[in-house]
Amino acid sequence: MPRNKGQRYPADPPTVAEIVAVMRQTPDKRHGYQVHAMIVVLWRAGLRVQEALELLETDLDEHRGSLLVRHGKGRRRREIGMDAWGWEQLRPWLAARAELPIGPLFCVIDGPTRGRAWSSSGVRFELHRLAVQAGVRRRFAPHQLRHAHALELAHEGVALNIIQRQLGHANLGTTSIYLQGIDTEEIIPTVHGRRGPMMSATAGLRL
């Protein structure tokens, strides 16, 4: 059993530059397209790795910009969004996947189990290998990409309840944990820069 099995790591999501550096390491062939696509759905849609591995090609709707998560945590079903850039990045793998046996979106490419589901350990191995190759020193794992997605949405001003639904959290408290990467230097100017309350609400207050 791995020594780190079940171990929790602090939220330390990779930066955009680090993620892109890793994506640039994916080779220009089918296996590389698949790893590239996996990074995309973990980062740009904020999926859990198991949710990504259970996706079917029919769960993707590029026209609507949506992905259907059939069995999220707690077996909850939800539909989530992904940006246009993310969809564009998926296309090479979608084209390559169409030439393989029908099955899950992310699958074994060669050998006797060709077309069957890819494993979460295989995903983690590839992400770690490519991160080392790219010179990324911080932990680069599926859940870190999910944290990066949540943090980026918060930076863009997306409401907490929408981030909660995108991530499939049962309560806002869990979502708040994902946003602990927002530091004091961001909080102070954001709150300091707020407008004063509406005049009708402050009528009669001493100035």
Where in this protein do the model-derived segments appear?
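Conserved catalytic core of the tyrosine transesterase superfamily
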Residues: M1-L207
